[in-house]
Protein backbone atom coordinates (compact mmCIF):
# COMPACT_ATOMS: atom_id res chain seq x y z
CA UNK A 1 0.00 0.00 0.00
CA UNK A 2 1.59 3.30 -1.06
CA UNK A 3 1.87 6.04 1.55
CA UNK A 4 1.61 9.12 -0.65
CA UNK A 5 0.03 7.69 -3.81
CA UNK A 6 -3.64 7.22 -4.62
CA UNK A 7 -4.80 3.65 -4.63
CA UNK A 8 -7.75 4.62 -6.81
CA UNK A 9 -5.85 6.01 -9.80
CA UNK A 10 -6.85 3.99 -12.87
CA UNK A 11 -4.39 2.79 -15.45
CA UNK A 12 -4.24 4.80 -18.64
CA UNK A 13 -5.85 3.20 -21.67
CA UNK A 14 -3.79 2.82 -24.81
CA UNK A 15 -4.77 5.13 -27.72
CA UNK A 16 -7.01 3.70 -30.44
CA UNK A 17 -5.88 3.11 -33.94
CA UNK A 18 -7.32 5.64 -36.36
CA UNK A 19 -8.18 3.15 -39.08
CA UNK A 20 -11.51 3.81 -40.80
CA UNK A 21 -14.03 1.01 -40.90
CA UNK A 22 -15.37 1.92 -44.33
CA UNK A 23 -13.57 2.21 -47.62
CA UNK A 24 -15.74 5.08 -48.92
CA UNK A 25 -12.93 7.58 -48.46
CA UNK A 26 -10.80 5.66 -50.94
CA UNK A 27 -13.43 5.79 -53.73
CA UNK A 28 -13.42 8.59 -56.25
CA UNK A 29 -16.41 10.92 -56.62
CA UNK A 30 -18.04 9.24 -59.64
CA UNK A 31 -17.92 5.81 -57.99
CA UNK A 32 -19.41 7.22 -54.79
CA UNK A 33 -22.26 8.83 -56.76
CA UNK A 34 -22.99 5.52 -58.48
CA UNK A 35 -22.87 3.58 -55.22
CA UNK A 36 -24.69 6.01 -52.97
CA UNK A 37 -26.58 8.18 -55.43
CA UNK A 38 -27.48 11.81 -54.99
CA UNK A 39 -31.18 11.60 -55.85
CA UNK A 40 -32.76 9.76 -52.95
CA UNK A 41 -36.37 10.34 -54.02
CA UNK A 42 -39.28 10.37 -51.60
CA UNK A 43 -39.14 8.00 -48.63
CA UNK A 44 -41.50 5.07 -49.06
CA UNK A 45 -42.55 2.21 -46.82
CA UNK A 46 -44.95 -0.70 -46.74
CA UNK A 47 -47.11 -1.02 -43.67
CA UNK A 48 -49.72 -3.76 -43.38
CA UNK A 49 -49.78 -4.25 -47.14
CA UNK A 50 -50.25 -0.54 -47.80
CA UNK A 51 -47.61 1.42 -49.69
CA UNK A 52 -47.00 4.89 -48.24
CA UNK A 53 -44.75 7.75 -49.34
CA UNK A 54 -43.71 10.95 -47.58
CA UNK A 55 -44.85 14.04 -49.48
CA UNK A 56 -45.07 17.64 -48.27
CA UNK A 57 -44.57 16.66 -44.64
CA UNK A 58 -47.26 13.95 -44.57
CA UNK A 59 -47.41 10.23 -45.22
CA UNK A 60 -49.83 9.59 -48.08
CA UNK A 61 -50.94 6.40 -49.77
CA UNK A 62 -48.79 5.70 -52.80
CA UNK A 63 -51.58 3.90 -54.61
CA UNK A 64 -54.99 2.56 -53.64
CA UNK A 65 -55.56 1.98 -49.95
CA UNK A 66 -56.32 -1.62 -49.00
CA UNK A 67 -60.03 -0.81 -48.52
CA UNK A 68 -60.35 0.38 -52.12
CA UNK A 69 -60.43 4.11 -51.29
CA UNK A 70 -57.95 6.30 -53.17
CA UNK A 71 -56.14 9.41 -51.92
CA UNK A 72 -58.69 11.88 -53.34
CA UNK A 73 -61.52 10.07 -51.58
CA UNK A 74 -59.55 10.12 -48.33
CA UNK A 75 -58.95 13.86 -48.65
CA UNK A 76 -62.64 14.43 -49.41
CA UNK A 77 -63.61 12.42 -46.34
CA UNK A 78 -61.17 14.36 -44.16
CA UNK A 79 -62.58 17.66 -45.43
CA UNK A 80 -66.15 16.46 -44.77
CA UNK A 81 -65.12 15.29 -41.31
CA UNK A 82 -63.66 18.75 -40.59
CA UNK A 83 -66.90 20.42 -41.74
CA UNK A 84 -68.98 18.12 -39.54
CA UNK A 85 -66.76 18.82 -36.53
CA UNK A 86 -67.18 22.57 -37.06
CA UNK A 87 -70.95 22.16 -37.39
CA UNK A 88 -70.99 20.02 -34.25
CA UNK A 89 -69.09 22.71 -32.33
CA UNK A 90 -71.54 25.36 -33.54
CA UNK A 91 -74.52 23.25 -32.49
CA UNK A 92 -72.99 22.66 -29.04
CA UNK A 93 -72.56 26.40 -28.66
CA UNK A 94 -76.20 26.97 -29.62
CA UNK A 95 -77.36 24.34 -27.11
CA UNK A 96 -75.32 26.03 -24.37
CA UNK A 97 -76.88 29.40 -25.22
CA UNK A 98 -80.39 27.91 -25.22
CA UNK A 99 -79.78 26.25 -21.84
CA UNK A 100 -78.58 29.58 -20.42
CA UNK A 101 -81.70 31.29 -21.76
CA UNK A 102 -83.91 28.55 -20.30
CA UNK A 103 -82.30 28.79 -16.87
CA UNK A 104 -82.64 32.59 -16.91
CA UNK A 105 -86.32 32.37 -17.88
CA UNK A 106 -86.94 29.73 -15.21
CA UNK A 107 -85.30 31.92 -12.55
CA UNK A 108 -87.42 34.91 -13.61
CA UNK A 109 -90.55 32.75 -13.50
CA UNK A 110 -89.75 31.58 -9.97
CA UNK A 111 -89.20 35.18 -8.85
CA UNK A 112 -92.52 36.27 -10.35
CA UNK A 113 -94.30 33.32 -8.70
CA UNK A 114 -92.78 34.34 -5.37
CA UNK A 115 -93.87 37.95 -5.82
CA UNK A 116 -97.36 36.80 -6.77
CA UNK A 117 -97.59 34.62 -3.66
CA UNK A 118 -96.43 37.55 -1.49
CA UNK A 119 -99.03 39.83 -3.08
CA UNK A 120 -101.75 37.25 -2.43
CA UNK A 121 -100.72 36.99 1.22
CA UNK A 122 -100.68 40.78 1.69
CA UNK A 123 -104.03 41.07 -0.10
CA UNK A 124 -105.61 38.50 2.25
CA UNK A 125 -104.29 40.36 5.31
CA UNK A 126 -105.96 43.58 4.16
CA UNK A 127 -109.36 41.96 4.01
Curated annotation (Swiss-Prot):
Pfam families in the cross-refs: Chibby (PF14645)
Main localization (coarse): nucleus
Keyword set includes Coiled coil: yes
Keyword field: Cell projection, Cilium, Cilium biogenesis/degradation, Coiled coil, Cytoplasm, Cytoskeleton, Differentiation, Flagellum, Golgi apparatus, Nucleus, Phosphoprotein
Ranges for region Leucine-zipper: 77-98
Coiled-coil region(s): 68-110
Annotated region described as Minimal region for the interaction with PKD2, given as residue ranges: 60-112
Keyword Cytoplasm (UniProt): yes
Residue numbers of Phosphoserine PTMs: 9, 20
Entry GO CC: centriole; centrosome; ciliary basal body; nuclear speck; nucleolus; sperm flagellum; trans-Golgi network
Family: Belongs to the chibby family.
Subunit and partners: Homodimer. Homodimerization is essential for nuclear localization and interaction with KPNA4 but is dispensable for interaction with CTNNB1. Interacts with polycystin-2/PKD2 and GM130. Interacts with the C-terminal region of CTNNB1. Interacts (C-terminus) with TCIM (C-terminus), TCIM competes with CTNNB1 for the interaction with CBY1. Interacts with FAM92A; this interaction facilitates targeting of FAM92A to cilium basal body. Interacts with CIBAR2. Interacts with KPNA4.
Function according to Swiss-Prot or TrEMBL: Inhibits the Wnt/Wingless pathway by binding to CTNNB1/beta-catenin and inhibiting beta-catenin-mediated transcriptional activation through competition with TCF/LEF transcription factors. Has also been shown to play a role in regulating the intracellular trafficking of polycystin-2/PKD2 and possibly of other intracellular proteins. Promotes adipocyte and cardiomyocyte differentiation.
Extra facts: 'Chibby' is Japanese for 'small'; the gene was so named for the RNAi phenotype seen in flies.
Protein name per the record: Protein chibby homolog 1
Organism: Mus musculus
Amino acid sequence: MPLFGSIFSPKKTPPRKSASLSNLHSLDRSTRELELGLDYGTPTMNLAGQSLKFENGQWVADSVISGGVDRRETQRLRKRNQQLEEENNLLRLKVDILLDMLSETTAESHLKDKELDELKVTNRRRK
